[in-house]
């Protein structure tokens, strides 16, 4: 687990699980899992990673920011595509190692860089992946 320079560590298990402060438990690479969910439809749009700076920017700006492992850099979702994700609610799980971000996608409403509304556009059927929008 990596210690954040932005968010304080949990004082104890009760503070972590029941406290009012956000104290994310970043992994050894300084990342926490993030799921983006459409605020109106409930559809899961994407999975990404956040470092402490991405999480702070998301909380401060109300626009989803992530951390790209392949580019090793911050990534403001939709900055170039126009598909910004406006945050309506951010939830953190019981042990604070994953976040659920409810968003309203802007632009054409897409979230996937391949062009689909959701990154989860393939279904396993009869031994193969089949493309299918939700």
Swiss-Prot record:
Indicate yes or no for the key word Glycoprotein: no
Name the Enzyme Commission number(s) assigned to this protein. 3.5.4.19
Kindly state which keywords UniProt assigns to this record, in alphabetical order: Amino-acid biosynthesis, Cytoplasm, Histidine biosynthesis, Hydrolase, Magnesium, Metal-binding, Zinc
List the GO cellular component terms. Answer: cytoplasm
Q: Which reaction does it catalyse?
A: 1-(5-phospho-beta-D-ribosyl)-5'-AMP + H2O = 1-(5-phospho-beta-D-ribosyl)-5-[(5-phospho-beta-D-ribosylamino)methylideneamino]imidazole-4-carboxamide
- Return the cofactor note field: Binds 1 Mg(2+) ion per subunit. Binds 1 zinc ion per subunit.
Q: Which Pfam families match?
A: PRA-CH
Q: Quick one: which residues bind Mg(2+)?
A: 93, 95, 97
The record ties this protein, via SUPFAM superfamilies, to:
HisI-like
As cofactor, the record names: Mg(2+); Zn(2+)
**What superkingdom heads the lineage?**
Bacteria
Give the pathway annotation: Amino-acid biosynthesis; L-histidine biosynthesis; L-histidine from 5-phospho-alpha-D-ribose 1-diphosphate: step 3/9
The record, for InterPro entries, names: PRA-CH, PRib_AMP_CycHydrolase_dom, PRib_AMP_CycHydrolase_sf
Chief place where the protein resides: cytoplasm
Single Gene Ontology MF annotation: magnesium ion binding
> What is known about its subunit structure?
Homodimer.
Its biological purpose is as follows:
Catalyzes the hydrolysis of the adenine ring of phosphoribosyl-AMP.
Q: Which NCBIfam families match?
A: PRK00051.1
Please report which protein family the annotation says this sequence is part of: Belongs to the PRA-CH family.
Report the protein name in the record: Phosphoribosyl-AMP cyclohydrolase
Species for this entry: Caulobacter sp. (strain K31)
